[in-house]
């Protein structure tokens, strides 16, 4: 983007920016908080700049991959047309619609159309499992189901949303290779294309093509979407997102991460890719299964970065590792050099120092990998650049936790004592001192206020702050603040192990500090702390810490006894791990379905218990 274009874009947004004061410290709320206003501004000021490019198929060579593209004005017009069609189909403001569409041009246009119409998209992770998906649909009670043919077939077979769904839309885009009639027979739903055609033909004025859709005027705290957590840290819950939350996230990406209009982003996570057009940034979507990033073909991603000269990359730790390994294996003559990239954002779980260092070899000098901390309920919370993170390695390897940086501007982080009890009202006396490990509590405009129809879960994770007139969110993560205000992660509250002796509490173990100590052993790829119950004196059950070990892929351990002995020696050298004397080798750790990076310790705990005798 030229400087003139950028200035015009900023001028067009100035009224909103002044009114909201960057969406942070001014309590005044805009009368129109619909997140789609950013797309309309882009369509007006940079109409023919590329908004979205989606890779089509796998291609015969990486140099000749094809992409479908939309500029900002076309994306805006298509979303307008779809919004008109949704209204004509009986979907109106305040209704809820499940959206199960793979990353595509339709995905972008549909999502913005829903926002424009004030229809609330319900987003779920297909990998969370059949039982969890069905429960999500029961709780959300959607009015409509919008999905690709596979999603509709699953809906019919498994009864998803049967009690509430009254409107169905099939998003095929002729990808299945079947006729519209056959597709409707298989899915039980009319196609999006047929709806658009009908809406256009039924209007002599051809409204969807020639008239701008009257975007719904929404309040700052009005529900914008329901985003279900993946279930990797517990039962999936619907997080209520307001338009104000989305606005705060956009402002954080602009101000704290430095993303500017005219940039191009390699978008590897569907939800984050939607921020591109809202930021005046192009979203480049490579061919990959976003639910299984570890299966992505690195060459597709490298080719997309090269073709579109991407300046930003959003990845999770699993994909960061995969891309870094691929770059490392390339011979020197064909070494990948990502010269256009000026920032990498890693989120979803803490990336390892080794992964970051390996990936950074492909970047130009001084280009940071920005490690972000947050959750579906509140994102982003804090951030640390790779150069600073590298200086914390020794602390992490010695059981000090993982540094996740300082709070994003406008976010307040506090640490409170560990408790399972609900905390209805905030009191500053709850706060622990610097260096004390407790539960992380956050507040800010990107922090959610409730779970959808989950009153108990809301009560367990929200604390009302009467002074700020907002809820603080209990992250369910443990950590501490150092003297300079940096946050250090020590693992999930549910993953701590409170060991007992003689039926009484003996010692508390935290997952990340313990695991990072054992990960320093050269044969250990990663480790996981779990608790097992063993028989103690007089037959009383005792809870003991156990470390599950995943070996480096190049190793086959036929000397486990020797390894365990070496690990016990390591354990006794640190106060955080003293007393750990049980170890088990696991072939392949189960991981979360969304990022393929968070270790599923709950499953490991069940496995470890089955392997434990007495």
Swiss-Prot record:
Keyword Nucleotide-binding (UniProt): yes
Recorded catalytic activity of this chain's protein: a (2R,3S)-2-alkyl-3-hydroxyalkanoate + ATP = a cis-3-alkyl-4-alkyloxetan-2-one + AMP + diphosphate
Keyword annotations of the record: ATP-binding, Ligase, Nucleotide-binding
Bridged cysteine pairs (disulfide): none
Pfam families xrefs: AMP-binding
Recorded phenotype for the gene knockout or disruption: Deletion of the entire oleABCD gene cluster leads to the complete absence of nonpolar extractable products. The oleABCD deletion strain shows a significantly longer lag phase than the wild-type strain when shifted to a lower temperature.
GO function terms (MF aspect): ATP binding; ligase activity
EC code(s) of this entry: 6.1.3.1
Annotated ATP binding sites: 229-237, 371-376, 477, 492
Family affiliation: Belongs to the ATP-dependent AMP-binding enzyme family.
Role of this protein: Involved in olefin biosynthesis. Catalyzes the conversion of 2-alkyl-3-hydroxyalkanoic acids to beta-lactones in the presence of ATP. The S.oneidensis oleABCD genes produce 3,6,9,12,15,19,22,25,28-hentriacontanonaene, which may aid the cells in adapting to a sudden drop in temperature.
Protein name: Olefin beta-lactone synthetase
Source organism: Shewanella oneidensis (strain ATCC 700550 / JCM 31522 / CIP 106686 / LMG 19005 / NCIMB 14063 / MR-1)
